[in-house]
């Protein structure tokens, strides 16, 4: 065996076990489920208000599934020899995605509990932005197997978050203006 044969043999020896690929499948399921919940929220805000409870139940089912997947990721983190990323990064990621699903569930739950007769412009716009952000996250997670650069997607999600903040604050401003206007009308009626 020549020197190139020995070096070739040494190069084929793996000193560390392969990175655990099971994480990618679980992370993809997690973000797909959160994206599904965001799709139901968008349909809830754009559809027939009488179907609110139906959409809310579907979103709650997505939240339950996200919670179960997040628990599976936590369990895998405990027993995995070599996860594809730092353990704390994976744990933070799964917790953050679960938090997104909880936020979506909370929004749908309030829509049903308060028996909102129809969604307003801001609700529909925010629903669309939440869906876009979830789709960006799905795209980023699916690319992680081959490309670790998720920076462009993170920037896109940040832009969507900024846009959502602007819509939210614009909606609040409009609401308070409506309240002031209604009070002024009531005050004029009381005087007149």
Segments (PLM) and residue ranges:
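Cytosolic, long alpha-helical scaffolding segments
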Residues: 1-192
């Amino acid at each position: 065996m020549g020197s190139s044969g020995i070096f070739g043999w040494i190069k084929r020896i793996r000193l560390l076990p392969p990175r655990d690929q099971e994480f990618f499948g679980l992370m993809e399921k997690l973000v797909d489920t959160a994206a599904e919940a965001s799709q139901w929220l968008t349909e809830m805000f754009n559809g027939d208000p009488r179907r609110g409870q139906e959409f809310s139940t579907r979103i709650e089912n997505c939240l339950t599934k996200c919670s179960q997947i997040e628990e599976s990721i936590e369990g895998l983190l405990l027993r995995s020899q070599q996860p594809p990323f730092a353990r704390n990064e994976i744990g933070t990621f799964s917790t953050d995605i679960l938090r997104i699903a909880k936020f979506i569930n909370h929004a749908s739950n309030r829509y049903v509990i308060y028996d909102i007769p129809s969604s307003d412009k801001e609700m529909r716009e925010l629903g669309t932005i939440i869906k876009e952000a979830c789709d960006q996250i799905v795209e980023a997670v699916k690319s992680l197997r081959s490309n670790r650069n998720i920076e462009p997607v993170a920037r896109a999600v940040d832009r969507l978050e900024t846009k959502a903040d602007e819509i939210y604050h614009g909606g609040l401003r409009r609401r308070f203006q409506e309240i002031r206007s209604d009070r002024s009308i009531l005050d004029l009626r009381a005087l007149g």
